[in-house]
């Protein structure tokens, strides 16, 4: 495995949005952008996922580029994994969506392997992240990094971009696996309120629909 790496993103100039949203709204946008820039001055926002391609990666590329264009130190890190790790996380991914996938287990052996892969990123994460930064973890592949991210002194947000409106045995299996990792997160983000599991009912939750209709 190559370890955690940073994805290079070209900033998007904020001025390009004026033609899209119009002059008055762009003025409001600029004021909000300036306030946001000042709020995050001297801090970095670290987005972490496990793949550089696909739907979440497409979203991250746009968000990171926009943040950089606003003068906010916005970063994107990708962790690496072996075939066993991706087999386990693909199984979790399917179960969160209510489908058993390959029907394989999510037991102690799978948990040990999952933790060994995400745990290999602890030292590098601690080198990069400073207290006061913000760490945003994306999807089940990075859920196991919550504790090590909090060790840096940074607030940690976990975003789950998948889900299903009606829970079943498969979703229960997935959340039994994931809940111990995300229980201590500072906030969670879901696309729909129906996707929030009962195990996270007391956690600060933000509902943020996907920016693209293709992802809904």
Explain the meaning of each model-derived region.
Residues 1-216:
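Catalytic cores of nucleotide-sugar-dependent glycosyltransferases that transfer UDP/GDP/TDP-activated
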């Amino acid at each position: 495995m190559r370890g955690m790496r940073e994805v290079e993103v070209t900033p998007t100039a904020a001025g390009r949005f004026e033609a899209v949203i119009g002059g008055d709204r762009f003025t409001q946008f600029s004021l909000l952008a300036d306030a946001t820039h000042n709020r995050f001055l001297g801090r970095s926002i670290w987005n972490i996922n496990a793949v550089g391609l696909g739907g979440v990666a497409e979203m991250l590329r746009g968000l990171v580029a926009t943040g950089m264009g606003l003068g906010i130190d916005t970063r994107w890190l990708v962790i690496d994994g072996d075939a066993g790790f991706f087999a386990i996380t693909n199984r979790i991914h399917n179960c969160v969506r209510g489908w058993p996938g390959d029907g394989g287990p999510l037991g102690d052996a799978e948990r040990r392997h999952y933790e060994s892969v995400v745990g290999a990123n602890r030292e590098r994460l601690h080198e990069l992240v400073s207290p006061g930064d913000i760490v945003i973890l994306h999807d089940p592949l990075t859920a196991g990094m919550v504790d090590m991210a909090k060790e840096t002194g940074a607030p940690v947000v976990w975003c789950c971009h998948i889900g299903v409106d009606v829970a079943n045995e498969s979703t229960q299996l997935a959340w039994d696996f994931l809940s111990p990792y995300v229980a201590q997160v500072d906030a969670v983000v879901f696309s729909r309120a129906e996707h929030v599991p009962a195990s996270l009912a007391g956690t600060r939750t933000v509902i943020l629909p996907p920016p693209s209709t293709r992802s809904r």
